[in-house]
């Protein structure tokens, strides 16, 4: 870091060190290479602008910067066809007299006439000249110059800058063009053109990202997605020969609007004689003198076969989240074409999973998904819980000048539709899963270990370490509607001298029919579970059972009575005291302890103190479905909701199922690890 007090002095010294006109007069001389080293070929390199130097210089940022500042490529001025051109900013370089004398002294003792070294140098020079003489080099340079000048208060008189995501769209388009038009010189041209974009420190591996066959952009509303696509396509057609571009929109009027905008742009800035238009099929053909024509085809997703049989090098899919799903196969088919790239661009509508499918690409092996929003993942929870927050607090937010975001806009839009501010205006691409992700309390590594590391409860070692008491929780449901809640049961055994527990049994039981025998059916299911566990685990001597009585206290007592009669093991029940009579009934009223039980369960999972048994018992879950996987599905759905009184509530109900089995396992684990509850014999009174 340069101290601010010394900055002016250093700038003055730098200014004095630069000889007047020195940089303008300096140029590369190809016929006098500098032979700096006599090392073996493996330890040296031929630099086209210097000579033979040690290979370690390939990592020298100073050398790279100096060579690029005097590269003849950047001295060539290609005039733009339209608008006002932009100069490529090049960092000036200078060699002081002292440095020049030191360099000559280092090279003075080395023979400059080494034939082998001269051959290596000549080869490097020829390679450099070939890349500059590449037939598509000037064509691609013209495209960049024209696009830069078009965006310099020509396309929009109020602006000469673009947003970062718009620049990235240009990069994906331009660098893919390099890879298909000059594949052999692609890496060299990558290095040359990255100076145009200011990507001085970007390595070659990062640049390979732009050669991907597909990329996805999720960008908030009104941020200039279609605007920049129109500019790119217009300059592609008029600057690059033999390029075939496709544009697909989700609605016909959008495709027609883009089609008309591109036509007007070309007619305004380029000769009309070069343009050939077929409005009936949305095609534009542009032909420059002595060049092959380039074409554009605009289509909609409603005619899913409209782009079949076409050849596109670049296919832009606008508002891709809203494309009809039966049109996707014809679009994705272009990924099989070697020289084709699909660019999906869409706003975010995460209120509906069907119009948020592009966000699923966040798990792709390649870095395909680019999301623009105003909230980072670390602060999404703060954003959701605090009503006054409208942007991420962790960094200085960049908001385009044409975008207004404040608390009043948030309140107004959310009055129209709850969550509209987050999903539509803020561009929160993860909002479809925000409720799940924000409240996600169990880590994926913990679930993987819970699933894979199962305890062999049948081994003598495990049996010696397990307590002989089985804890069973029954959450009864008196309905035969399989779409609604069923009876959940969870059985847990604790380990001796440890906080560890093992889940040994789960049930999710639905009544076959609504009769007066529902209590008998539920009790029979619980008795069958205890019998199976007693058979597999002979060390279990008794069962401590808690039967939830929130739905029906009479039925809960009936279940306890029937289970007491049918259980193969001695059974003790958790009792609830009647405040009026003082009588204790064999049932449990679930209340505020549920949150504490969930917290204990979540902590046990994340700390790996809760496991499942290899021989886990379930008589009701399908044989084709692993009971542990069935339980993990419900664990993943656990959500923590803050309440107005400062407390929290836990729930795992989701659209695809209920949380009955999970609640039973959570409560069984809670009773197995807590010393606050006393289990007593059936119907024992105070």
From Swiss-Prot:
Tell me which UniProt keywords the record has, alphabetically.
Answer: DNA-binding, Host nucleus, Hydrolase, Viral genome packaging, Viral release from host cell
Question: Motif span (Walker B motif)?
Answer: 314-319
Q: Where is this motif: Walker A motif?
A: 219-226
Q: Where does it sit, as one GO cellular component term?
A: host cell nucleus
Q: What is its EC number?
A: 3.1.-.-
Where in the cell does this protein reside? Host nucleus
Q: Provide a GO biological process annotation.
A: chromosome organization
Q: Where is the active site?
A: 319, 475, 548, 660
Give the primary localization class: host cell
One of its Pfam families is: DNA_pack_N
Molecular function terms, GO-annotated? DNA binding; hydrolase activity
Q: How does it assemble?
A: Interacts with the terminase subunits TRM1 and TRM2. Interacts with portal protein.
Q: What's this chain's function? A: Component of the molecular motor that translocates viral genomic DNA in empty capsid during DNA packaging. Forms a tripartite terminase complex together with TRM1 and TRM2 in the host cytoplasm. Once the complex reaches the host nucleus, it interacts with the capsid portal vertex. This portal forms a ring in which genomic DNA is translocated into the capsid. TRM3 carries an RNase H-like nuclease activity that plays an important role for the cleavage of concatemeric viral DNA into unit length genomes.
> What protein family does this chain belong to?
Belongs to the herpesviridae TRM3 protein family.
Its recorded name reads Tripartite terminase subunit 3
Organism expressing this protein natively: Equine herpesvirus 2 (strain 86/87)
The organism that produces this protein has a lineage beginning with: Viruses, Duplodnaviria, Heunggongvirae, Peploviricota, Herviviricetes
């Amino acid at each position: 870091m340069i101290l601010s007090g010394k900055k002016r002095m250093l700038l003055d010294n730098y200014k004095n060190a630069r000889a007047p006109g020195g940089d303008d007069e300096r140029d590369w001389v190809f016929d006098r290479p500098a032979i700096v080293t006599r090392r073996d070929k493996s330890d040296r390199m031929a630099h086209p602008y210097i000579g033979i130097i040690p290979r370690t210089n390939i990592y020298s940022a100073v050398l790279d910067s100096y060579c690029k500042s005097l590269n003849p490529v950047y001295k060539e001025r290609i005039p733009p066809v339209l608008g006002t051109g932009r100069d490529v900013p090049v960092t000036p370089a200078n060699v002081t007299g002292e440095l020049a004398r030191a360099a000559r002294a280092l090279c003075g003792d080395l023979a400059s006439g080494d034939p082998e070294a001269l051959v290596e140098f000549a080869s490097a020079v020829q390679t450099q000249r070939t890349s500059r003489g590449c037939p598509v080099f000037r064509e691609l340079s013209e495209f960049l110059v024209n696009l830069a000048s078009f965006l310099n208060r020509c396309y929009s008189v109020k602006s000469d800058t673009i947003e970062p995501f718009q620049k990235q769209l240009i990069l994906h388009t331009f660098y893919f063009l390099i890879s298909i038009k000059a594949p052999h010189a692609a890496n060299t041209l990558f290095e040359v053109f990255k100076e145009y974009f200011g990507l001085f420190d970007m390595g070659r591996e990062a640049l390979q990202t732009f050669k991907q066959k597909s990329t996805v952009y999720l960008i908030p509303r009104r941020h200039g997605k279609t605007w920049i696509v129109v500019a790119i396509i217009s300059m592609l057609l008029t600057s690059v020969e033999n390029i075939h571009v496709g544009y697909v929109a989700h609605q016909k009027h959008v495709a027609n609007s883009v089609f008309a905008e591109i036509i007007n742009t070309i007619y305004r800035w380029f000769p009309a004689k070069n343009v050939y238009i077929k409005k009936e099929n949305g095609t534009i053909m542009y032909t420059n003198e002595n060049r092959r024509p380039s074409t554009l085809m605009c289509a909609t997703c409603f005619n899913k076969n409209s782009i079949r049989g076409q050849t596109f090098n670049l296919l832009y899919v606008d508002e891709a989240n809203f494309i009809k799903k039966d049109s996707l196969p014809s679009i994705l088919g272009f990924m099989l074409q070697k020289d084709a790239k699909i660019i999906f661009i869409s706003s975010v509508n995460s209120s509906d999973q069907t119009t948020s499918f592009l966000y699923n690409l966040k798990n792709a092996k390649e870095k395909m998904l680019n999301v623009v929003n105003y909230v980072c993942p670390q602060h999404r929870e703060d954003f959701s819980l605090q009503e006054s927050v409208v942007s991420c607090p962790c960094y200085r937010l960049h908001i385009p000048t044409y975008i207004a975001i404040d608390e009043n806009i948030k309140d107004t839009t959310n009055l129209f539709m709850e969550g509209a501010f987050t999903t539509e205006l803020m561009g929160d691409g993860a909002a479809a899963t925000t409720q799940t992700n924000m409240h996600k309390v169990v880590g994926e590594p913990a679930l993987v270990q819970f699933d894979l590391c199962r305890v062999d409860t049948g081994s003598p070692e495990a049996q010696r370490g397990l307590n002989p008491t089985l804890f069973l929780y029954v959450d009864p449901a008196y309905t035969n509607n399989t779409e609604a809640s069923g009876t959940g049961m969870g059985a847990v055994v604790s380990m001796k001298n440890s906080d560890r527990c093992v889940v040994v049994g789960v049930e999710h039981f639905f009544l076959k029919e609504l009769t007066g025998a529902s209590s008998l059916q539920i009790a029979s299911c619980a008795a069958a579970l205890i019998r199976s566990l007693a058979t597999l685990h002979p060390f279990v001597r008794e069962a401590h059972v808690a039967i939830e009585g929130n739905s029906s206290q009479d039925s809960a007592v009936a279940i306890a009575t029937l289970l007491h009669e049918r259980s193969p093991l001695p059974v003790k029940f958790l009792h609830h005291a009647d405040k009026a009579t003082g009588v204790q009934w064999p049932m449990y009223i679930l209340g505020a302890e549920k949150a504490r039980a969930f917290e204990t369960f979540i902590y046990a999972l994340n700390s790996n103190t809760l496991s499942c048994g290899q021989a886990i018992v379930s008589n009701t879950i399908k044989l084709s479905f692993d009971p542990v996987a069935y339980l993990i599905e419900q664990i993943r759905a656990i959500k923590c909701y803050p309440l107005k009184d400062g407390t929290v509530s836990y729930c795992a109900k989701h659209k695809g199922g209920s949380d009955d089995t999970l609640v039973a396992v959570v409560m069984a684990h809670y009773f197995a690890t807590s010393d606050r509850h006393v289990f007593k014999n059936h119907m024992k009174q105070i």
